[in-house]
């Protein structure tokens, strides 16, 4: 992201929407979070591979609901605290009223979902944990006010071996 490689002609030719995240699996290129997750779920099904979603139909639906909400709402927060605040440098600008309202909404929803001391939303890891933690980390990494239990949840998700391996690879 820092090098803006996702705006290079080669990237744009390979990935239809030229968006990040992007997945290159062999000769198959795909962008957009939801499409990537659905592809991975189909290409690497459980039980041979770790499931991306909870086993229960209601928990799975709740996880997908949360993901859809994260992607479709909170636009002011996403604009004012892009993922660059996590991976590159914090923003020195305070949140606007709209950004603060989105942050407050995120914190309210996350606080209602993350139990005290819980590392996961649904008892065991699922992809919605990673997405929620990444969204919360837009605030945490920037030093914006976030309740301690949510900071702990973000740290627990960020400490996952898969996340650490990806961070080292991208670093």
Question: Model segments located where?
Answer:
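Conserved serine/cysteine hydrolase catalytic core
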Residues: 166
